[in-house]
Design a protein with these regions (language model features):
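Bacterial N-terminal signal peptides
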Residues: 11-22
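Polybasic, low-complexity, intrinsically disordered segments
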Residues: 22-26, 407
Length: 407
């Protein structure tokens, strides 16, 4: 097929205990999301964590980068959809997404204690100032658990909105090596007289080297939050940090709430801005064929610090490009490579079978279609019915051909 529909155990110990609290929810096009309860010693409470695994995670052996996200309940669905859309279009790597839900949001996401008082002289946010402890929870409990019980690559992204954006900036300047990239959406840098903004300005002025990507954004938000964002963007424009990539984007047609969806889209595009394999501008064909595509992903491996395999769907596209240009033999070799690299995928067998069938070699196509339907059933592949129909059609055709020869 030319396209493919895509859709743990946790660390048990003194510090952390994960317990599955509800069934996994599989949604077409957005992988599988599990809702887990976490008992944290650092925070002294139980937290709910949502973990989204990519389509095919249960049936392959691939490892994935991880996007950690605050406000997990609010943003998991649209973020998973954004990731799936970008992955299908070859723009980013597929990701495991870990969304942490809230108990005391202000406590966890604010670096500084609040001194603001109400008319009665009482603190408006008496629990504020726990961001360092929340970051410790990420570093010592959450991330080790995820990395033990899920197949992850050594690449971490942190995304947060509003106070979560403030937390992302605080994390970057407090522990710049803890995450590889940051997405800070409408960061509340006006918090407590711009305390975190001032530290960020000093950090950006004095830091010498940091292999990190930062994407920051804001909607049409006047007042202190907008002014603080502009100050951050100004500080970013003056920095000379080696290996540091950044983008600060205003979206004047969005507000404080609606800006998140597009920010996650553009933030991931910034982090993975060179991800897409180069194509010929005239024909749209992948430049350099399979060798050129493999060379591109080798460069990405060097940039991201882990082995980045050429994606199955991209190799599949290359095969169909060749098939469409009448280069059947070359297409078959590409499809064979996909079978070698992704033997657990039903679709790779189906595609190779189709190439053989188009060339009139139904005797070679039939067992491959059979393999595709067997794997499709085993993997609960949404395209199983198509694989089965292809096998039955070619099997019947082969029997008819054999019967004719006997006459």
């Amino acid at each position: 097929m030319t396209t493919r529909s895509k859709l743990g155990r946790f660390l048990f110990g003194l510090a952390v205990l994960f317990v599955i609290s509800s069934a996994a929810v599989a949604q077409p096009g957005s992988g599988t999301v599990k809702r887990l309860a976490l008992k944290s010693t650092v925070l002294g409470e139980e937290r709910v964590v949502l973990v989204r695994t990519p389509v095919g995670y249960e049936t392959n052996t691939l490892k994935y980068p991880v996007l950690y996200m605050t406000d997990g309940d609010a943003h998991m669905a649209h973020t998973a959809g954004t990731i799936e859309f970008l992955v299908q279009n070859g723009r980013i790597a597929d990701l495991i997404v870990v969304g942490v839900t809230n108990t005391d949001r202000t406590r966890d996401l604010t670096p500084a204690k609040s001194t603001n008082k109400n008319a009665a002289g009482e603190l408006q946010n008496p629990t504020a100032g726990g961001a360092d402890n929340f970051l410790k929870f990420f570093e010592t409990e959450l991330m080790p658990a995820i990395e033990k019980d899920y197949r992850v690559q050594p690449y971490r992204i942190l995304a947060g909105h509003s106070l979560g954006g403030l937390f992302a900036i605080h994390a970057m300047i407090s522990k710049p090596g803890l995450f590889n990239s940051y997405i800070a959406v409408s960061p509340s840098l006006q918090w407590e007289n711009r305390e975190a903004l001032k530290r960020a300005e000093d950090f950006l002025k004095n830091q010498k080297e940091m292999k990190v990507t930062l994407y920051a954004s804001i909607g049409d938000e006047p007042g202190a939050i907008g002014e603080s964002f502009d100050a951050l963007r100004d500080a970013l424009s003056k920095t000379n940090i080696k290996d540091f990539a950044w983008q600060a984007q205003r979206m004047d047609d969005e507000d404080h709430g609606s800006v998140v969806l597009r920010s996650h889209y553009f933030g991931l595009r910034k982090i993975y801005e060179d991800w897409r394999a180069p194509r010929d501008p005239q024909s749209g064909a992948f430049a350099g064929g399979l060798k050129g595509v493999d060379a591109h992903y080798k460069k990405l491996s060097e940039r991201f610090g882990y082995s980045v395999p050429t994606p199955e769907n991209l190799i599949n596209q290359l095969g169909y490009q060749l098939l469409g240009r009448g280069q059947a033999d070359e297409a078959i070799e590409v499809f064979k490579t996909n079978v070698e690299r992704y033997p657990a995928s039903a679709n790779v067998y189906d595609s190779l079978a189709e190439a053989y069938e188009r060339g009139g070699k139904i005797d070679l196509a039939e067992p491959l279609y059979d393999r595709a339907q067997i794997l499709g059933k085993q993997n609960n592949d949404p395209n199983f019915a198509i694989y089965k129909a292809n096998y039955e059609r070619v099997h019947a055709k082969l029997k008819e051909t054999q019967a004719t020869k006997k006459q």
